[in-house]
Amino acid sequence: MVREGNAESCFRMRLWCIAVLGLALLSACFIVSCVVTYYFTHGNTGKRLSELHTHHSNLTCFSEGTRVTEKIWGCCPGTWKPFGSSCYFISSEENFWAKSEQNCIGMGAHLVVINTETEQDFIIQQLNKTFSYFLGLSDPQGNGNWQWIDQTPYKENVRFWHQNEPNFSAEECASVVFWDGRGWGWNDVFCDSKRKSICEMKKIYL
């Protein structure tokens, strides 16, 4: 009976050791995961902030909810308009499409990419009906294969062309423009025509 008791005690001890070892391994994995997550989250955020500060003198941040223990802040350059996960800048200069994109890149952004109707509605509220504004949408080959500047898929269900547009293959760039009786909509235009433009960049989250 004593031997059986000792054997049972040894068996329980082994189980306990295995459980402790397993718990230790899980804890180690959790710690490593937290360190990696912190590095990528804060490291990338710091890098992005550094990049933005080379183009913009100040940032404006807005509370956008909370994590488990802290608030989430979404930040945009001071003169930019925040919406969703992006920041938008309406250029007052008129340039060719390529120059407009170059100017956006110089600010750490790109010509605007419109993904939803709510985004389109927000953007047109910021615009002057007198002007036409370049979008980050073009048809480089003039064959109807429209492409967004950031490689976002050109969605069939997210298009806001004016009626009967696009209608001319030589007009290989897109703009958003207000037409009397029709309101705001997209229009294909010559890329070397001069227009205002809209830049977009992702918010910085702190």
UniProtKB/Swiss-Prot annotation:
Domain C-type lectin: 83-200
Binding site for alpha-D-mannopyranose: E165, P166, N167, E171, W179, N187, D188, R195
Extracellular side: 37-206
Cystine pairs: C61-C75, C76-C87, C104-C199, C173-C191
Residues engaged in binding Ca(2+) 1: V113, N115, E119, E200
CC terms in the record's Gene Ontology section: external side of plasma membrane; plasma membrane
One Gene Ontology MF term: carbohydrate binding
Membrane disposition: Single-pass type II membrane protein
Keyword annotations: Adaptive immunity, Calcium, Cell membrane, Disulfide bond, Glycoprotein, Immunity, Innate immunity, Lectin, Membrane, Metal-binding, Signal-anchor, Transmembrane, Transmembrane helix
Tissue specificity comment: Expressed at the highest levels in lymph nodes, at moderate levels in skin, small intestine, liver, and lung, and at lower levels in abomasum and spleen, but is not in the brain. Abundantly expressed by Langerhans cells compared to macrophages.
TM regions (residue ranges): 16-36
Residue positions with a glycan: N58, N128, N167
Binding of Ca(2+) 2, residues: E165, N167, E171, N187, D188
Chief location bin: membrane
InterPro entries: C-type_lectin-like (IPR001304), C-type_lectin-like/link_sf (IPR016186), C-type_lectin/snaclec_domain (IPR050111), C-type_lectin_CS (IPR018378), CD209-like_CTLD (IPR033989), CTDL_fold (IPR016187)
Any single Pfam family the record assigns to this protein: Lectin_C
Notes on the domains: A short stretch of the intracellular domain (AA 8-14) proximal to the transmembrane domain is required for association with Fc receptor gamma chain.
Subunit composition and interactions: Associated with FCER1G. Heterodimer with CLEC4D; this heterodimer forms a pattern recognition receptor (PRR) against fungal infection.
Name of this chain's protein: C-type lectin domain family 6 member A
